[in-house]
């Protein structure tokens, strides 16, 4: 669950409805892989991730980024039940993929950077604060199975 006021929820959902999940998803995942290169070990099957240019040109990074943000969008539709929404993904990442749950926070922060870059002045301090709450809630829900 994310503690947003009714006005904050309305603002977050309005901005989210403008997000190009393919573009922003690929960029957010790409940034994660470049800024935190140790995360690349989970994506060895993606091919060449040897340079930032290779990461951002990688079709598999773009496709998986879109998949990630599409799933994130499902969470946006269920802000009051994030743990339920992400229960199966939490189990997958914990039991099968063995992803360090700290990576969910890192990816959330990359998403905030990408949204700020794409939306400029529209992504003001208020919107930033709201989205930090959302990405923290999603990261917490994804880490739920680990507890």
UniProtKB/Swiss-Prot annotation:
GO CC annotation: blood microparticle; haptoglobin-hemoglobin complex; hemoglobin complex
Stored InterPro entries: Globin, Globin-like_sf, Globin/Proto, Hemoglobin_b, Hemoglobin_oxygen_transport
Residues with Phosphoserine modification: 45
Classification via Pfam families: Globin (PF00042)
Keywords in alphabetical order: Acetylation, Heme, Iron, Metal-binding, Oxygen transport, Phosphoprotein, S-nitrosylation, Transport
S-nitrosocysteine modification, residue list: 94
UniProt GO BP: hydrogen peroxide catabolic process
N6-acetyllysine PTM sites in chain numbering: 60, 83, 145
Domain Globin, residue spans: 3-147
Tissue expression as described in the entry: Red blood cells.
Binding sites annotated in the UniProt record for heme b: 64, 93
Post-translational modification N-acetylvaline, affected residues: 2
CDD domains in the record: Hb-beta-like
Listed GO MF terms: haptoglobin binding; heme binding; hemoglobin alpha binding; metal ion binding; organic acid binding; oxygen binding; oxygen carrier activity; peroxidase activity
Subunit structure: Heterotetramer of two alpha chains and two beta chains.
Family: Belongs to the globin family.
Function statement: Involved in oxygen transport from the lung to the various peripheral tissues.
Annotated protein name in UniProt: Hemoglobin subunit beta
